[in-house]
């Protein structure tokens, strides 16, 4: 990541949680990044984070997974709210960007803070876990419990698009397994993923919202993004050519979309499906 990045801490309950900062406050909104399941700033935003910092102030949280049963989305969204309270001035405009589970958390933050959040960008997010997603999570949990050598390959099959994988040899695809490092925190987050349902909170979102779907996503099907689009007023929808790992397959496009919508939302009319500028 960018050498000018600053890592700091903020108080939450009786903890000190890490967040990262890059860029300077400007005429554009300050961006808050929220990573996905089993991730952190480095894993999910290593390219996106510093590139966004060229034009505006960007904060990225490393979420803490509480050691408790029956996690709730608010166990994470309240961490983001605490970061905003600690690190963002009252007169700073805010754009919240969430990826995957981070998109679910971002939606919860926007619903809770209402007008405090000016813009909301949901990357590969969902509102209510489908039976297909539950099946995939069940397989993941079983492979994790068994410490199966097949788990990293299953994760990569779900994570990447056919186009991304098919450009690599069989051995190169198998070698991707070395980047998958499942953890107990990820397992607890996936248990939460199994029962996500934020549909009742979506009408409370007042932020101008951009919903980004990944056309070849095996983890979060496009239908989930369409449900978000139908449920959030003042939203617009775009599909990009990528699997779930858009931070690897389409990072430049993500940076472009986030910059354009955060800085110039008037270019994206509400309640419209937007055509991507990249093929």
Where are these regions (language model features)?
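Gly/Ala-rich beta-loop-alpha elbow adjacent to hydrolase catalytic centers
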Residues: 98-102, 106
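Conserved alpha/beta-hydrolase catalytic His-Asp/Glu region
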Residues: 131-134, 149-201
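Short beta-strand/loop motif that positions the catalytic acidic residue
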Residues: 205, 211-213, 217
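Acidic catalytic loop of the alpha/beta-hydrolase fold
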Residues: 215-220, 245
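Flexible "cap/lid" loop of the alpha/beta hydrolase fold
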Residues: 107, 111, 118-147
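Active-site loop/oxyanion-hole signature of alpha/beta-hydrolase fold enzymes
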Residues: 46, 59-95
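Catalytic histidine-centered segment of alpha/beta-hydrolase-like enzymes
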Residues: 242-255
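Conserved HGGG/HGGXW glycine-rich cap/lid loop of the alpha/beta-hydrolase fold
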Residues: 11-67
